[in-house]
């Protein structure tokens, strides 16, 4: 699935002025390209809420080009929690590392016995050709008993998709009921949302 977003080249406009005008400054880049751009903040919010880092966003440029991209980094204003800068990675024919959503299906046998399914990862880092990017990877958890876990090596990957993480990475597990409260406490103690959603190519701006 892909989404479309109008983008404009920056020709000397200051980022602060663009933000005051409701625009979001950014950069589009790959190994052969590095160009400053901006997009409408409201339109970006609409598209990014759906596409996130998992789906292709096609930038429609004033010169008629339509470039397929993935969002690699979004910097947020610390006080208002709104985007200040975005990095778009421009896709080519070369394989790319990206996060693909996981879709869990089935009810684990262990859940029927009173256990709780712990979804440790909601997406997985893979290496894939842009033409083979899947919308999601289905994960069948119906066979998991209490105490069982499912690892990256257990995933049934679509053709042309390779793991970019350790095969031993735990994806999901069914835990005993008595562990649920402990897991909730651990989740509450986790670090708050990072300012940078995904690390990409940084740009220094005044």
UniProtKB/Swiss-Prot annotation:
Top-level taxon of the source organism: Bacteria
Gene Ontology CC entries for this record: cytosolic large ribosomal subunit
Basic and acidic residues biased stretches: 195-206
UniProt keyword list: Ribonucleoprotein, Ribosomal protein, RNA-binding, rRNA-binding
GO-annotated biological processes: translation
GO molecular function terms listed in the Swiss-Prot or TrEMBL record: 5S rRNA binding; structural constituent of ribosome
CDD domains: Ribosomal_L25_TL5_CTC (cd00495)
Chain spans, region Disordered: 184-206
InterPro entries per UniProt: Rbsml_bL25/Gln-tRNA_synth_N (IPR020056), Ribosomal_bL25/Gln-tRNA_synth (IPR011035), Ribosomal_bL25_b-dom (IPR020057), Ribosomal_bL25_C (IPR037121), Ribosomal_bL25_long (IPR001021), Ribosomal_L25_dom (IPR029751), Ribosomal_uL5_bac-type (IPR020930)
Assembly mode: Part of the 50S ribosomal subunit; part of the 5S rRNA/L5/L18/L25 subcomplex. Contacts the 5S rRNA. Binds to the 5S rRNA independently of L5 and L18.
PANTHER family noted in UniProt: RIBOSOMAL PROTEIN L25/GLN-TRNA SYNTHETASE, ANTI-CODON-BINDING DOMAIN-CONTAINING PROTEIN, RIBOSOMAL PROTEIN L25_GLN-TRNA SYNTHETASE, ANTI-CODON-BINDING DOMAIN-CONTAINING PROTEIN
Function statement: This is one of the proteins that binds to the 5S RNA in the ribosome where it forms part of the central protuberance.
Family (UniProt): Belongs to the bacterial ribosomal protein bL25 family. CTC subfamily.
Cited NCBIfam families: bL25_bact_ctc (TIGR00731)
Protein name (database record): Large ribosomal subunit protein bL25
